[in-house]
Structure formats: C-alpha cells, structure tokens
Amino acid sequence: MGYLQKEWLVYFYEAPYHSEYDWMYFLKKGFKHCGALGYDPHQKLWTHLEFTHEGTAMEHLNQKEIDDIINYMYDFKMLRCPVRRDWQLFRIKDMNCVSWIMRLIGYHRWYIFTPYQLYCALIKDGYSSFYNTNGQKKEKNSRTDNR
C-alpha cells in the first residue's frame, strides 16, 4: 500500500537562466517558479515534483540531494503546506506551475496566477515558512555552501 502525502514543502525561486526569458519579466524577482518536495516516512524517501513547459518532472532524492536543494532554497522561500481535501465543482484554470502546485496541495483560488500571488495568499492563510523556528531563520548549514 502506498502513502498518501499529508504535507508538501512548496518552494518559490528564480533560476539563473530565468532572466533569459523576456516573458518572465513581469514576474516578481525570486518568484519566477514553484515546485514541491514531499517525504514518505514509510519508505524514508524524498520526492521532488515540478511542472515545467516540458511536462511533469518527478524525482526521488537521496539525502545529499535533498540537503543541496534545501540549502539552495534558503535564499528563496519555502512553505510547509498541509494538503487540503476540499472538493471543487468547476476548476477551469490555465496549466502552469502555480495552478499545478495549487491542485497538489488542494488550495483553490481563481485569482492566483503568479508564484508571488500564491506565496502571499498562503502566508495570509497562515501557512508557515519551512525555515522559521520561533520567528527566526535557522542558521544556514555552513558545511554545504552552494552559492
């Protein structure tokens, strides 16, 4: 039997090559794309999910790979997002990374189109930062500085 994911770590970032695309100019800096990380405690396995123009990308990650991603994303934003099981009758929405992540975590708002709008809506609804501990950011892991 499989494991039904109860929470995702949703990240928002801007890759170095995003500046090459003129159509991304209107998106807020640091919020050009979003994806998700999930952990299966039964298999002790991390899963990375991302929707791109090439299709859906899914990777299973080892501990070093997940450490590298979490350290890289430290300079951007990552939220803990419990999955909602709200049923929606009519969900016509464009298919991009934002709408895909919203469906993944069961978050439905018709007016959200950009990664930054999604981030702001999640924060407003009480979702918390993965990196925050008692209102402060954790120290970056000094043993793996990939910037």
Give the predicted meaning of each segment.
Residues M1-Y11:
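Extended, non-globular alpha-helical segments
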Residues L61-R103:
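Aromatic/basic micro-patches that form nucleic-acid/chromatin recognition or nuclease catalytic surfaces
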Residues F12-I70:
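Glycine-rich catalytic cores of cysteine/serine-nucleophile enzymes that process amide/ester linkages
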